[in-house]
Amino acid sequence: MDSPSPNSDPLTIGGRQFNSRLFTGTGKYPSMTSMQQSIERSGCDMVTVAVRRVQTVAAGHEGLMEAIDWQRIWMLPNTAGCTNAEEAVRVARLGRELAKLAGQEDNTFVKLEVIPDARHLLPDPIGTLNAAEQLVKEGFTVLPYINADPLLAKRLEEVGCATVMPLGSPIGSGQGLNNAANIGLIIENAGVPVVVDAGIGVPSEAAQALEMGADAVLVNSAIALAGDPAAMASAMSQAVMAGRTAHLSGRLPRRDQASASSPTTGLVQSPQ
C-alpha cells in the first residue's frame, strides 16, 4: 500500500474537503509573527478563531483578521467564553458574520464550546446539546467540543452535528489522551469525523490519536507555548501524517506471548 499524501487522503467535513488533518488555533502565541509562521509550518488549512476575542480586540488578537490569508485558510469561528447555550448561539451567529467579513460568504462552520466552569474548562454536555440542536436548525455546520462521552457523541451526531470533538484531557493541560478508551469507543461508533481536541502536548500524542482512528486533531497550546512554536507546528504536522499512515496500514495485533521474527525451522544444530 502506498503511503497517503495529504492531497490523496482529504478529510471531508460538512461537504468541504481539507487536505491537512491538523487544525490549529490563534491564541497564546508570543507574537502575531510567531502565529503566522506556525500556521504556515503546520500545513493546516483550517484555523479556529475565538469570536469574542476578535470582536472585543482582546490582547494578542489585534490585527488577527488581517494577519491570516483567509483565501487559503478556512475559518473555524468558536464560541469560547460562552457559559450557556443561549450565549453560544448568539456568538455563533456573530462568528458567521465574521467569516463573511473575511470573504468566506458560504462559511457556516462553528466550533461549539459551552464552558460554565472557568477553572477546569470542561464543557457542559446539556448546554452543548441544546445549542447544537438550535444551530443545526439555523443551518450551521456544528463541530461540538465535548467530554469523551460516547453516548453524548452519538446524540450530537443524531441531531445533525458535522463532527464530534472529544477532549483528550483538559484544555491547555498537556496531559495527552487521558480518555483514550472512551475516545476509542467514540471513533468505533461514529458516523461523522472525530476530531480530538484539547490536551495534546507533544507530537507523539497527536500521532496516537490518528493511529487510534481519529480523523483529525486540533492543537493550539502545545504549538503556541512551545519554545519554538513554528518548529513544533512542523513536528505536529509530521506526527499527524505518520499517525494517519499507521492507522491505514493496520497495526500488528497484540499478543499475550512472544512471536519469533525469524523462522524456527532449518536451524543450525550445534554438534553433540
Swiss-Prot record:
Its EC number is 2.8.1.10. InterPro entries: Aldolase_TIM, Thiazole_synthase_ThiG, ThiG. GO terms for molecular function: thiazole synthase activity. It comes from the Bacteria. GO terms for biological process: thiamine diphosphate biosynthetic process. Keywords: Cytoplasm, Schiff base, Thiamine biosynthesis, Transferase. Coiled coil: none annotated. Its main location: cytoplasm. Pathway: Cofactor biosynthesis; thiamine diphosphate biosynthesis. 1-deoxy-D-xylulose 5-phosphate binds at residues 172, 198-199, 220-221. Pfam families: ThiG. It is found in: Cytoplasm. It catalyses: [ThiS sulfur-carrier protein]-C-terminal-Gly-aminoethanethioate + 2-iminoacetate + 1-deoxy-D-xylulose 5-phosphate = [ThiS sulfur-carrier protein]-C-terminal Gly-Gly + 2-[(2R,5Z)-2-carboxy-4-methylthiazol-5(2H)-ylidene]ethyl phosphate + 2 H2O + H(+). Residues 249-272 are annotated as: Disordered. Residues 258-272 have a biased composition (Polar residues). HAMAP family: ThiG. Belongs to the ThiG family. Catalyzes the rearrangement of 1-deoxy-D-xylulose 5-phosphate (DXP) to produce the thiazole phosphate moiety of thiamine. Sulfur is provided by the thiocarboxylate moiety of the carrier protein ThiS. In vitro, sulfur can be provided by H(2)S. Homotetramer. Forms heterodimers with either ThiH or ThiS. This is Thiazole synthase. It comes from Synechococcus sp. (strain CC9605). The lineage of its organism: Bacteria, Bacillati, Cyanobacteriota, Cyanophyceae, Synechococcales.
